[in-house]
Swiss-Prot record:
Chain's gene name: IAA4
Single GO BP term: regulation of DNA-templated transcription
Upper lineage: Eukaryota, Viridiplantae, Streptophyta, Embryophyta, Tracheophyta
Motif mapping: EAR-like (transcriptional repression): 40-44
Keyword Transcription found: yes
Organism: Oryza sativa subsp. indica (Rice)
Purpose: Aux/IAA proteins are short-lived transcriptional factors that function as repressors of early auxin response genes at low auxin concentrations.
Assembly, per entry: Homodimers and heterodimers.
Induction summary: By auxin.
Name of protein: Auxin-responsive protein IAA4
Family note: Belongs to the Aux/IAA family.
One Pfam match: AUX_IAA
Length: 203
């Protein structure tokens, strides 16, 4: 009986819960759930940490872009091009601000001057002169010859002490050749296109 009891107790005592099919399945399922929950927590923490690091990097890059001042390169190129000297730039700005519309507003009034018998012409800025007398003196000095002109009061007036062999004429806006001095100086400046020093015997 003792052996039987001992033998009867031996199978029940030697039976392990791990070898039982139902208990083994339950233990495996619990272990799998624990592993899955651990993996999910790890994955969530990894994804959260990686996404937060990406967000921090993007915010740092945006802050760096905002801190760098944007330089309008195109506007600087257009503003500084063409490379001209400061005084020339200011002169061009003044000329553009002044605009046209008359001899008084213009800064320069260059006209071509030709002398009969001389193949090479000259250029003269009429706005640097203050009247017909200064124009005549300037042309006499340029061409080394005495020149006369017709003024408003008289047909011809010679320079005192000199015998003029040439007379000054000009081409107006209509293409007609006129005697210099027939109209007031301001009207002459608004209509003159070209000057010609002609011989007296041909006028």
């Amino acid at each position: 009986m003792e052996e039987c009891k001992g033998g009867g107790m031996s199978p029940s005592s030697s039976m392990d819960s791990s070898t039982h099919p139902a208990l083994s399945t339950t233990s495996s399922a619990a272990t799998a759930r624990r592993d899955l929950s651990t993996d999910l927590r790890l994955g969530l923490s990894l994804s959260t940490s990686s996404s937060s690091s990406l967000l921090q990097a993007a915010a740092a890059a945006a802050a760096a872009d905002d801190s760098i001042p944007s330089t309008p390169r195109n506007s600087q190129v257009h503003a500084d091009w063409p490379p001209i000297k400061p005084f020339l730039r200011s002169a061009l700005q003044k000329a553009s601000a002044a605009g046209g519309g008359g001899a008084r507003r213009r800064r320069t009034l260059f006209v071509k001057v030709y002398m009969e018998g001389v193949p090479i012409g000259r250029k003269l800025d009429l706005l640097l002169l203050d009247g017909y007398d200064s124009l005549l003196i300037k042309l006499c000095h340029m061409f080394k010859t005495p020149i006369t002109y017709a003024d408003v009061m008289e047909c011809h007036q010679q320079v005192p002490g000199q015998k003029a062999a040439h007379v000054l004429t000009y081409e107006d806006q209509d293409g007609d050749w006129m005697m210099v001095g027939d109209v007031p100086w301001e009207l002459f400046l608004s209509s003159v296109k070209k000057l010609r020093i002609a011989r007296m015997d041909k006028c």
